[in-house]
């Protein structure tokens, strides 16, 4: 275990470094860049050491650099009693060995079983999602069909309105023609009546004038008129012969 003094000594620099790193992580504009969650975990060695640590040492110390650094660090911690080996250390070492054996032996089986369960759950979710997408797509198609039918109903309603308007127009024209025929017939009747009245009036007037004129002519005037007419005709005949 690490000693309490070493932990207290290292606590302040770690806090300052964490504060500086948090301040440096914030962007100048106040926006923080979010990390993306990796799909697969990174590569490790010895079960818990990241591969990036080894790559960092490879460029500077070669292949044996990480292992030399690790052995030297452990030796330094143990020799300076920063890391004290008490009874819990050996218990932890035993548990670590058992855990490593369990991971090596049972890990692949458990991982295979867990992957199968995950695949099963994923397939169920995928089937449910595909079924839901199918239901939604069918609902969309049905809605489009209903909208098309609604548009057809509107067109049918417009056609019915136009048909009714044409029927009303035909009825109006028929009634207007009937009114025109009736008015023309009555006007023709009135015109004919006026013509008959005018002819009757003319006939009565001619008869009245003729009767009065004949009544006013005496037998002597009639005789003189006839003699004058005969004389005029004789003179006209002589003129025609001389010509």
From Swiss-Prot:
UniProt similarity note: Belongs to the eukaryotic ATPase B chain family.
UniProt entry keywords in alphabetical sequence: CF(0), Hydrogen ion transport, Ion transport, Membrane, Mitochondrion, Mitochondrion inner membrane, Transit peptide, Transport
Signal sequence, start to end: none
Database matches in PANTHER family: ATP SYNTHASE F(0) COMPLEX SUBUNIT B1, MITOCHONDRIAL (PTHR12733:SF3), MITOCHONDRIAL ATP SYNTHASE B CHAIN (PTHR12733)
Subunit structure: F-type ATPases have 2 components, CF(1) - the catalytic core - and CF(0) - the membrane proton channel. CF(1) has five subunits: alpha(3), beta(3), gamma(1), delta(1), epsilon(1). CF(0) has three main subunits: a, b and c.
Name of the gene this protein is made from: ATPsynB
A Pfam family it matches: Mt_ATP-synt_B
Compartmental location: Mitochondrion; Mitochondrion inner membrane
Organism of origin: Drosophila melanogaster (Fruit fly)
UniProt-listed InterPro entries: ATP_synth_Bsub_B/MI25, ATP_synth_F0_suB
Gene Ontology CC terms: mitochondrial inner membrane; mitochondrion; proton-transporting ATP synthase complex
Protein name stated in the entry: ATP synthase subunit b, mitochondrial
Function per UniProt: Mitochondrial membrane ATP synthase (F(1)F(0) ATP synthase or Complex V) produces ATP from ADP in the presence of a proton gradient across the membrane which is generated by electron transport complexes of the respiratory chain. F-type ATPases consist of two structural domains, F(1) - containing the extramembraneous catalytic core, and F(0) - containing the membrane proton channel, linked together by a central stalk and a peripheral stalk. During catalysis, ATP synthesis in the catalytic domain of F(1) is coupled via a rotary mechanism of the central stalk subunits to proton translocation.
Matches recorded under SUPFAM superfamilies: ATP synthase B chain-like
